[in-house]
Amino acid sequence: MTPSLFERAETFRDRTAIIAPEGVFTYGNLLDVSATVATRLLAGRDDLEETRVCFLVPPSWEHIVTQWGILRAGGLAVPMAISHPSTELDYVLGDAEPEALVAHPKLLDRINIAADRRAIPVLQTPALVADGPVGELPTLLPARPAIMLYTSGTTGRPKG
């Protein structure tokens, strides 16, 4: 059986995974922070059971730990393109029907109205990735869906 992404990351826990303006992050750092993100997303539940969670986060270590956290909680990660105009982001939110939206504070103004209209809770990355307790995470099977990607929508609406 092929090791999962998280098993591989655990194997290389002390190795550098990302060098960013905010610092150097090891695979262990990413695993630890994503476990905290997963715990916060679970909010006392055992498993998100493939519930969709959209996230609008610039390419960064926060993007990685947000995506990993959604996956580790058993959710279906729906990354949103920061290059899309607000109308396309609104469309993706409506089409994906997520339970929650994770957004970077710099991008809130582009998505808040659409999330409010749909009563989708918005979680901001600084609070989500801050140090915190880690709870029991669900066991994930390799065949479980992980990510729902949307096309760029160059010839029409984005498709997921």
What are these regions (language model features)?
Residues 48, 95-97, 118:
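Active-site charged/polar residues at nucleotide-handling catalytic sites that mediate phosphoryl
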Residues 23, 38-84:
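Conserved AMP-binding/adenylate-forming
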Residues 8, 30-34, 53, 70, ...:
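Adenylate-forming
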Residues 3-26, 44:
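AMP-dependent adenylate-forming
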Residues 13, 133-150, 157:
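Conserved pre-ATP/AMP-binding loop-to-beta segment of ANL
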Residues 15, 49-51, 142:
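Phosphate-coordination loops involved in phosphoryl transfer and adenosine-cofactor binding
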Residues 57, 80-81, 103-104, 119-128:
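Short beta-strand elements of ligand-binding domains
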Residues 84-114, 130-132:
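Conserved ATP-dependent adenylate/AMP-binding module captured primarily in the ANL superfamily
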